[in-house]
């Protein structure tokens, strides 16, 4: 007979969004019972070091943990690690979650913050030796260990944010790195061309082989039989990565960095609306009023553009988790407190990426943005900024990408995006690095 327990708040997913939801709940409700269920053996941890400090050895696994044990004790949170929610029954009487150990948990409100899993490509067998993804802390530890034990040649398939960061980190520790991308340039297609070309050149200057316009056709594990093949640690075989261009890249470790697939299956089976993520309103409530969502899996209406989209970045996970927690608690305690009015998502989507010494920041909704306005000059062979490209739409700035830019300029760019100011009369000042962007933004806002 299944064991049954009841909690007021069930947090499904063991990432940063669920962690911050604890803070949001406790800011409203100090007494409600909270259960956090995560499928990893680690408590919630920070993901940014996975492609950087963990790989270089500058950050330990313990240092990635977002909070110490006393945080969970102080907030009276029970944490179930290495456990999955396998089913949700959202019956009108009492919703029930079934856990992987057979336990049934009834709940008042739930947060669905399951994030996503690494996308595997057709050429790779998930059980294949010497082929890995980089999504979890255990993935990063395994990549680091493989390289440390002699896996000196690494092929990375996918040159987006994670692929580029991983390439820089592996090159830093002395690995021979090849970066393979099916698109014609590295980094996301929506990013400005000068930045994408600069990152490619920067990686190339540090010994990274960059293959763009090249998809992987197959892996040839008979590479060990060819002269010069290097075995993977533990005596397993090296690979040859055969590309669509006819090129062949030898590697004793292949890392797939092809983005993520949102973990929506359990929600979809339960009848929750799904569209490349959990569909929600601006209070982060899903199509079932008892279930909220946050983090990488949440498809949220953008606070500036209004477009519903997923944002797969740390800042968004923190903000949305905190907001969802507050709103869940306001909702559950509405009958006894005057805190029933939920807050709406009002976050300017931001991201950052550290590729070696390059620090890139971005904000806004860059879909269909025109990147014709640049502040500073960025040439592949030139200095790494400071430089900002502004994404334009109807004479307003809707997004930016900044490389090694001053904090004051970044703050000013965010103000211009949030306030949707017409900048058509000050484009020369926006471009001119001698004119403080904060002064330009301040003048526009003052004269609105």
PLM region descriptions:
Residues 31, 79-99, 105, 173-280:
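A Rossmann-like FAD-binding core segment of flavoenzymes
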Residues 407-424:
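A short, polar/charged loop-to-alpha-helix boundary motif
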Residues 423-448:
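Cysteine/selenocysteine-centered motifs that mediate thiol-based redox chemistry or coordinate metal-sulfur cofactors
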Residues 1-12, 66-153, 157, 227-230, ...:
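FAD-binding core/adjacent interface of flavoenzyme oxidoreductases
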Residues 18, 163-164:
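N-terminal Rossmann-fold NAD(P) dinucleotide-binding loop
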Residues 127-150, 240-242, 247-323:
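FAD-site-proximal beta/loop scaffold in flavoenzymes
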Residues 2-78, 169-191, 411:
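Beta1-alpha1 glycine-rich phosphate/pyrophosphate-binding loop at the start
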């Amino acid at each position: 007979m299944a064991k049954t327990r009841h909690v007021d708040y069930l947090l499904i997913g063991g990432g940063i969004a669920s962690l911050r939801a604890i803070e949001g709940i406790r800011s409203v409700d100090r007494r409600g019972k909270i259960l956090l269920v995560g499928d990893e053996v680690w408590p919630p941890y920070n993901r940014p070091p996975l492609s950087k400090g963990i790989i270089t050895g500058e950050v330990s696994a313990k240092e990635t943990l977002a909070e110490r044990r006393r945080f969970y004790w102080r907030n009276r949170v029970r944490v179930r690690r290495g456990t999955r929610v396998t089913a949700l029954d959202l019956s009108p009487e009492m919703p029930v979650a079934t856990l992987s150990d057979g336990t049934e948990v009834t709940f008042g409100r739930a947060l669905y913050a399951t994030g996503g899993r690494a996308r595997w490509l057709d050429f790779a067998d998930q059980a294949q030796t010497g082929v890995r993804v980089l999504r979890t802390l255990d993935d990063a530890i395994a990549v680091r260990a493989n390289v440390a034990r002699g896996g000196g040649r690494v092929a990375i398939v996918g040159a987006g944010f994670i692929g580029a960061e991983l390439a820089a980190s592996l090159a830093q520790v002395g690995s021979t790195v090849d970066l393979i991308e099916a698109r014609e340039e590295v980094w996301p297609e929506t990013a400005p061309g000068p930045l994408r070309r600069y990152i490619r050149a920067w990686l190339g200057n540090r010994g990274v082989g960059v293959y763009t316009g090249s998809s992987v056709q197959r892996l040839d594990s008979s590479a060990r039989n060819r002269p010069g093949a290097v075995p993977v640690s533990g005596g397993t075989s090296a690979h040859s990565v055969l590309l669509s261009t006819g090129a062949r890249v030898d590697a004793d470790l292949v890392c797939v960095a092809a983005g993520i697939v949102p973990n929506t299956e359990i929600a979809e089976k339960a009848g929750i609306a799904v569209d490349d993520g959990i569909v929600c309103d601006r209070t982060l409530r899903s199509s079932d009023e008892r279930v909220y969502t946050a983090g990488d899996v949440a498809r949220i209406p953008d606070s500036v553009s209004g477009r519903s989209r997923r944002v797969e970045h740390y800042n968004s996970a923190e903000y949305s988790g905190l907001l969802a927690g507050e709103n869940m608690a306001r909702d559950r305690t509405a009958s006894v407190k005057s805190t029933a009015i939920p807050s709406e998502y009002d976050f300017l989507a931001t991201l950052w990426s550290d590729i070696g010494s390059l620090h890139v920041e971005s904000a806004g909704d860059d879909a269909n943005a025109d990147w014709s306005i640049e502040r500073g000059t960025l040439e592949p062979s030139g200095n790494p900024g400071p430089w900002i490209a502004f994404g334009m739409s109807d004479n307003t700035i809707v997004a930016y990408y900044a490389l090694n830019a001053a904090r004051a300029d970044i703050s000013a760019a965010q103000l211009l995006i949030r306030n949707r100011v017409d900048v058509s009369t000050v484009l020369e000042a926006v471009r001119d690095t001698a004119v403080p962007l904060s002064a330009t933004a301040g003048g526009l806002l003052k004269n609105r």
